[in-house]
Amino acid sequence: MPGWSCLVTGAGGFLGQRIVRMLVQEEELQEIRALFRTFGRKHEEELSKLQTKAKVRVLKGDILDAQCLKRACQGMSAVIHTAAAIDPLGAASRQTILDVNLKGTQLLLDACVEASVPTFIYSSSVLVAGPNSYKEIILNAHEEEHRESTWPNPYPYSKRMAEKAVLATNGRLLKNGGTLHTCALRLPFIYGEECQVTSTTVKTALKNNSIIKKNATFSIANPVYVGNAAWAHILAARSLQDPKKSPSIQGQFYYISDNTPHQSYDDLNYTLSKEWGLCLDSGWSLPLSLLYWLAFLLETVSFLLRPVYNYRPPFNRLLITVLNSVFTISYKKAQRDLGYQPLVSWEEAKQKTSEWIGTLVKQHRETLHKKSQ
């Protein structure tokens, strides 16, 4: 597929930015369009550096702006759609999450049809498949099981419906008479340098005598390193354009993980940060069943207050379930169809992430030093 081009939505985000950085290394790629709505100054500087390369074009626009999407898609060979409102807690309104994740995806699919873009890769989530209960044990989930989330919460619901829309659009006729081919990648928790969840966890711990609060003691999960998650998207874009590989990939979804050890989220946080003196809270924790029912009570209070006050609980049943479930996935189908193998080993991913956490610790200490002067 010589001379191909690619649009990446959500290019200012954690995953999207890494995909753009890796696409720059693709020798046969003629043009990369990086579409974003908002991002921090650091991300802006990095994308600006990438823009100095002839094949990177940075675009600012909204995933809900149909005309913007049509312009962004014009002349592209492929679209990698990572833009999303990632909000399991429901901090944003239900309508906002549905608009960004579902309506935005539908608008982008329509833009691909109008602009005759033949390849569409969707960044989905394992939450479209579960876990539905913290009592359920799921080990090495695979695509043939056809698991489906039953949560009504806007984030898993919107991602599930958006994935269905993407896969259902496979085979749709393009304006130029061609055919749109789609696939979806279901991603678990993504960690690595610049991960906002990890950053918040570390900064909170540093304000608490370097003690990491335990929130996910009972979980067993297999998170994926951001570099490997990005690599899977590039392989999917390549494979879906390959006449030999494409027929078996069209309309399919794939679980993506790597060789990160299966462990609790608490243990992952500790493993990545222990070099810098952070440790897990050794105090007593509430029983999981009690936490779950407390979350139910808080959700009930939020619902009853809704007509007069917008109360957002600090946690909900979905979050308690996700953070405390035994839910692991297998990426064998991605290995078979996409030729996916993790680029970055666990040891290297751990080292890179730990070094980045070290910069957060250093910044915190410098801030404390300035305040004490």
Curated annotation (Swiss-Prot):
Pathway the protein acts in: Steroid metabolism
Localization in the cell: Endoplasmic reticulum membrane; Mitochondrion membrane
Topology relative to the membrane: Single-pass membrane protein
Chain positions found as N6-acetyllysine: 350
TM stretches of this protein: 288-308
The protein's Enzyme Commission number: 1.1.1.270, 1.1.1.210
Pfam families: 3Beta_HSD
Keyword Phosphoprotein: no
The keyword Transmembrane helix belongs to this UniProt entry's keyword annotation: yes
Family designation: Belongs to the 3-beta-HSD family.
Protein name, UniProt field: NADPH-dependent 3-keto-steroid reductase Hsd3b5
Chain's gene name: Hsd3b5
